[in-house]
Amino acid sequence: MKRFLLASICWAVACLPLFAQQISKEELLFLTPEWKGERFPDGRPKVSDALLKRMRRVTHEEAWAVMKGQNYKYQYAEGWQVINPDSVLVGRALTATFMPGRPDVHRVIDKKGHEKDGRVKSQNAWPIDMLVKGDVYVVNQFGAHKDGPTIGDNLGNSIYAKTGNGIVYEGAIRDIAGLKEIGGFTSFYRSYHPSHHLNNPDGELNTTLVGINQPTLIGGVMVMAGDIVLGRDGAVTFIPPHLVEKVVTTSEIVRLRDMFGHERLRQQKYTPGQIDNRWTDDIEKDFSQWLNAHINELPVPKEQIQEYLKKRTW
């Protein structure tokens, strides 16, 4: 009997996020303890706009190397179709998780949303109403294709107006021509279908919203609300907020060292072997002098270069 009771309690605790639907501030704080910076009122980590701007130049390789070194091995998702494939998508994740529609669950979620939580319209609009500038809407639509799309050009325009960004969508979208016309709606999605989702629990139903800002699964990655989305070159990397500054700073240092190395190779001052291997003290000193001489011309903020130079001994 005690074993049964314990199992029941564990099951209930495990299901709390589902019944609560939107994650509580307390739970979000519990799941993101390594983030010590600013947060939104609901507890979502708020990485600064300045870091988001610098993140736009980071490559997947640079982000991957830093995160792998911190034992974060499953942060990269590939195999997407892309709107604006030559653009870069960067922002703070706001997540939504859908499951195949189930009438009884759908009804109680609708009832709670409309009567207790102040939600309006259908469930697919609820997370969108929460978006703010700099967010990226990240959706687990369980790969739904036909009758699966919850986003077309109407909601796409609303998302872009609120965030200035596109989306990451584990499923099919619709109105692809209209979404492309938005211009800056750089998005990563699995497929396209002209149909739309069905959300009537008393009629046709195929999708139910079960989580807002809960941990969700996107392409083999556990995505947390507040993770930084880096979408470029056909793939998406999700960076935990407490690693963002390290990723950005490392990327900038690598970028500067590459620029210096390439310039010196063109000048034939050093051999490829000297540049590819650990730099000697003389090369490091030359690099510091080069940074000082070009500090106003480099694609890294002057303040960041000055901070970097303070820590160098050459």
State what each model feature region is.
Residues 1-4:
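Positively charged n-region of N-terminal signal peptides that target proteins for export
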